[in-house]
Amino acid sequence: MTPEFFPENINVISTKRYNQEKPKVFSNGFDSFNIADHVGDDPERVSGNRKKLVQYLNLTSEPRYLNQIHSDKCLRFSSIECEGDALYTNKKNEVCAILTADCLPIFITDTLGQEAAVIHAGWRGILQGVIEETLKSFVSKKLVAHFGPAISKENFQVGSEVRDQYLSKDKSFNSAFKTISSKNYLDLYHAARLILNRHDIYKISGGTQCTFRQKDEYFSYRRDGKYSGRMANLIWIG
């Protein structure tokens, strides 16, 4: 798919929790199209799912996956490092991938379609600056963004210490929180939008899905706990 505002040569996809070739069977989070190999699922099934993804998308190369650590690290596709939470490329057919269940996947490209990146933006990563660090990788300053599926504010309760950390970093994050009966709820979409806007990125699509609420479509760690699989979020330059 090509999101709104994105050049036609930029390819973006977020997988769902089921393989459309099979019935939806949800006795646990792993009886479906899980792409993560670190959550306790059968390694052979995960490997098979990854191969099906490559075949379905007719990719010429394997996606590059990271060992995600909720950090601010953005790696170039060619980097020998394996730990990080964002991938950047400026070459064709280098498929950058991050895995999510509730965290926010952010896709970024320039208006000419010569650079691309995908970010794993959970509350920790956003707080640590993973979005800002990824933007530093881009040569172009004319950028657009797309939000993949993440947990919605209504279903993402966080502790008061999380809110305090955000407000200590920037008071404007107050608008990303809602407090109901002394309970704090964080809007990841809004928090990310604030950061992107501060870097003159206003053309942003997506941000309407909820991984927690849309059980038939998405994995959710907050909803399913340790039996939650992960969706793959891919971007590449065609």
Q: How does the language model describe each region?
A:
Residues 1-238:
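Active-site microenvironment for binding and transforming phosphate-containing groups
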